[in-house]
Amino acid sequence: MQKLLLIAIAGGLGSLSRYSLAGAVQRLFGASFPAGTFVVNITGCFLFGLVWGFLEDRLTLGPAARMIALTGFMGAFTTFSTFIFESVALLNSSQWLFAALNITGQIVLGILLLAAGLYLGKLV
């Protein structure tokens, strides 16, 4: 139960960080390009790798600490970093087909299903 509470707290902090960073960046760049989301996603990828590497190589806090930091904070900050991490893991293990399916599938299906949801949402 304590681990779940810590993940929830880390998730709340990740959400607030995402909101704050995306909003600040978007105000700087204006509304013509989704710069806030762009910066959050690429920053999230860097931070995910940094935190993962730090927890793996520098601290031996165990899987619970990784779960709190990566699933809690980073999961709420951006799921894009998880998508990239899982894709790189597939590539690193030479699972080319699964990597290609993961990358193209999530992007193409994500666009198609968002469009379908938008269409259906307007019908209701």
UniProtKB/Swiss-Prot annotation:
Cross-referenced InterPro entries: FluC
Catalytic activity entry: fluoride(in) = fluoride(out)
Domain of life: Bacteria
Membrane-spanning parts: 5-25, 35-55, 68-88, 96-116
Annotated binding of Na(+), by residue: G75, T78
Membrane topology: Multi-pass membrane protein
A Gene Ontology biological process term: cellular detoxification of fluoride
Pfam families, per database record: CRCB
GO cellular component, one term: plasma membrane
Any one GO molecular-function label of the UniProt entry: metal ion binding
Regulation: Na(+) is not transported, but it plays an essential structural role and its presence is essential for fluoride channel function.
The keyword Transmembrane appears for this protein: yes
Localization annotation: Cell inner membrane
Disulfide bond positions: none
Keyword Transport: yes
Function: Fluoride-specific ion channel. Important for reducing fluoride concentration in the cell, thus reducing its toxicity.
Sequence similarity: Belongs to the fluoride channel Fluc/FEX (TC 1.A.43) family.
Protein name, UniProt field: Fluoride-specific ion channel FluC
